[in-house]
Swiss-Prot record:
Family: Belongs to the dethiobiotin synthetase family.
Protein name: ATP-dependent dethiobiotin synthetase BioD
EC number: 6.3.3.3
Protein encoded by which gene: bioD
Function recorded in the entry: Catalyzes a mechanistically unusual reaction, the ATP-dependent insertion of CO2 between the N7 and N8 nitrogen atoms of 7,8-diaminopelargonic acid (DAPA, also called 7,8-diammoniononanoate) to form a ureido ring.
């Protein structure tokens, strides 16, 4: 089974939406969100709204889709601490590397926030990637400032020799000035391909998804 880690340039760049679109596109795929904060109680269990979308799409138990759940809508290390817990990055890595789902050939693993979001006092998602070496799909929320955020993300990945499979332009605002020019700038400056584009909450537009 191929595994991909879906991360983003920042919070609210559209990782969950894009991940759902990828699962819709690939009929032999599923998605999980191993760590989520901002969970609320529903039917006597903590539920994260993003993870719930994956669970409803995959028809998998929530315990498989989202095993690490915390209440406060803050960085995972802070939310876990407030719940009297801590996140062991090695356990998260083992879980994501060893999870098997029947008839699934592609597993999309959605992170929380960006690459440098802390999971505990020492480790970030980058440390998770160093342990797992799972290829990255970078979701770029197309808005003012995205070029800077995207190039910084590329630098972090390259310095740490983490493979990036490609990036997806998630067009958040149909009125964004010079949207196509911004995408062209990123295509010229990034060292990995533009896989797809999503337009204002619409379906994913295939550009190079066959490489996955």
């Amino acid at each position: 089974m191929k595994r991909y880690f879906v991360t983003g340039t920042d919070t609210d760049c559209g990782k969950t939406f894009v991940t759902n679109q990828l699962v819709n596109y690939f009929s032999d795929s599923a998605a999980i969100k191993p760590i989520a904060s901002g969970c609320e109680y529903s039917e006597n269990q903590l539920v994260n709204s993003d993870a719930l979308l994956h669970q409803q799409q995959n028809h998998l138990p929530m315990e498989i889709v989202n095993p690490w759940r915390f209440r406060l809508p803050v960085s995972p290390h802070l939310s876990a601490r407030e719940d009297g817990a801590s996140i062991d990055v090695h356990k998260v890595a083992d879980y994501c590397l060893n999870l098997q789902v029947n008839d699934i050939k592609k597993l999309f693993i959605e992170g929380a926030g960006g690459l440098m979001v802390p999971l505990n006092e020492q480790d970030t998602w980058l440390d998770f990637l160093k342990l797992t070496r799972i290829p990255v799909i970078l979701v770029v929320g197309m808005k003012l400032g995205c070029i800077n955020h995207t190039l910084l993300s590329q630098e972090v990945l390259e310095i740490n020799k983490i493979k990036c499979q490609g990036w997806i332009a998630n067009c958040l605002d149909q009125d964004m000035l010079m949207l196509d020019e911004n995408i062209s700038t990123l295509e010229a400056k990034l060292n990995y391909p533009l896989l797809a584009r999503t337009n204002y909450g619409g379906k994913i537009s295939d550009i190079c998804l066959s490489s996955l």
